[in-house]
């Protein structure tokens, strides 16, 4: 039996009825996802080439999250070329067994400095960072209760769910309800952990971060913030809204991405040294996987360093976002009132 015949044999053994039912339901409800086959060309951002089923055409990519075009910036590409020539393509292992290159160490130091934290920890994506940090917090604090904003990202929701910890969901940005939940947790001898985002991806509004920190201080709660739509874009050095508001030292754990504004790939958390040490010791999603490519680390580090010193890039991005919203409004296309950011 050759390889193709063997594969067909095993495929026949699968009961396709549940699969076909799922796919039909997704298509009938309009929730079936279709990939856009595009090719971004360096130097032409945000233009791209779209490969359709019947034709190929030039497009303007309005849905990219490469907010600042750093994915095509010369300083990033040059850094990646240098690393590729020096180290080759991959890391060669997990972080604990040969997969910690000097590029990983240097990038984690750069991230720690960006967020004014003692340590940081790289993950293969910000989704994985969220998921496995939250799972790890449950292992470290058995009596933890997660207090989650109702508009949190799927990675936060899944991380809490997979941790099997108790959770309470508070209405979006509702500080009265959050304080009530914190008080109840303390009365129940639990460790409250407030999980929220700085910039919410679906409607572009921001959280009342200072008020959340005040509540956390009052009830000795852990604070966990997702800054993936803010790092690189806000703050004097691109440290996100926590830097912009001077709250970096009041947030226990900051999650960020090396995609989006930094234009590369990967995710991280930044926190106290002991917190990072504990999480790296128990997070299976960190331990048992090949680490990021040193090439990606080099590109991300170059992007972070560049954006630390180039506020004009952030200013231009904000000006363009403001102009777009004004033109949409002028043409009777509704912009959500709560969308006070670039989203």
What is each PLM-predicted segment?
Residues 7, 14-15, 21-87, 221:
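N-terminal "arm"/small-domain region of PLP-dependent enzymes with the aminotransferase-like
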Residues 66, 168, 172-225:
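Active-site phosphate-binding strand-loop segment of PLP-dependent enzymes
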Residues 77-125:
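Conserved N-terminal alpha-helix of the aminotransferase class I/II PLP-enzyme fold
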Residues 125, 147-163:
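Substrate-binding/gating loop at the entrance of the active-site cleft, primarily
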Residues 237, 243-278, 292:
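Active-site PLP attachment segment
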Residues 295-315, 326-330:
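Amphipathic alpha-helix from the class-I
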Residues 316-322, 329-343:
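Conserved PLP-binding catalytic core of the aspartate aminotransferase-like
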């Amino acid at each position: 039996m050759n390889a193709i015949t063997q594969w067909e044999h095993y495929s026949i053994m699968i009961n396709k009825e549940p699969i076909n039912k799922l796919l039909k339901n997704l298509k009938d409800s309009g929730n079936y996802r279709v990939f856009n086959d595009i090719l971004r060309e360096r130097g032409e951002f945000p233009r791209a080439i779209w490969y359709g089923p019947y034709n190929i055409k030039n497009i303007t990519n309005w849905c990219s999250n490469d907010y600042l075009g750093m994915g095509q910036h010369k300083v990033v590409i040059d850094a990646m070329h240098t690393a590729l020539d020096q180290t080759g393509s991959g890391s060669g292992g997990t972080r604990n067994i040969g997969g910690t290159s000097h590029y990983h160490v240097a990038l984690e130091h750069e991230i720690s400095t960006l967020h004014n934290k003692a340590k940081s920890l790289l993950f293969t994506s910000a989704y994985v960072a969220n998921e496995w940090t939250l799972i790890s917090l449950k292992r470290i604090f058995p009596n933890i209760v997660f207090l989650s904003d109702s508009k949190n990202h799927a990675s936060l929701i899944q991380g809490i769910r997979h941790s099997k910890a108790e959770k309470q969901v508070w209405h979006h940005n509702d500080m009265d309800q959050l304080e009530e939940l914190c008080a109840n947790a303390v009365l129940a001898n639990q460790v409250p952990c407030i999980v929220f985002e700085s910039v919410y991806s679906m409607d572009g509004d921001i959280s009342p971060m200072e008020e959340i920190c005040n509540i956390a201080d009052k009830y000795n709660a852990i604070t966990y913030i997702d800054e993936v739509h803010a790092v690189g874009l806000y703050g004097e050095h691109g440290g996100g809204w926590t830097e912009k508001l001077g709250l970096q030292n009041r947030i226990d754990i900051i999650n960020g991405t090396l995609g989006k504004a930094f234009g590369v790939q990967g995710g991280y958390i930044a926190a106290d040294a002991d917190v990072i040490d504990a999480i790296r010791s128990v997070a299976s999603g960190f331990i048992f996987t090949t680490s990021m490519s040193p090439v990606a680390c080099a590109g991300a580090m170059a992007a972070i360093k560049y954006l630390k010193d180039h506020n004009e890039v952030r200013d231009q991005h904000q000006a363009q976002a403001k102009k777009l919203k004004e033109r949409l409004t002028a043409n009777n296309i509704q912009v959500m009132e709560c969308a006070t950011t670039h989203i």
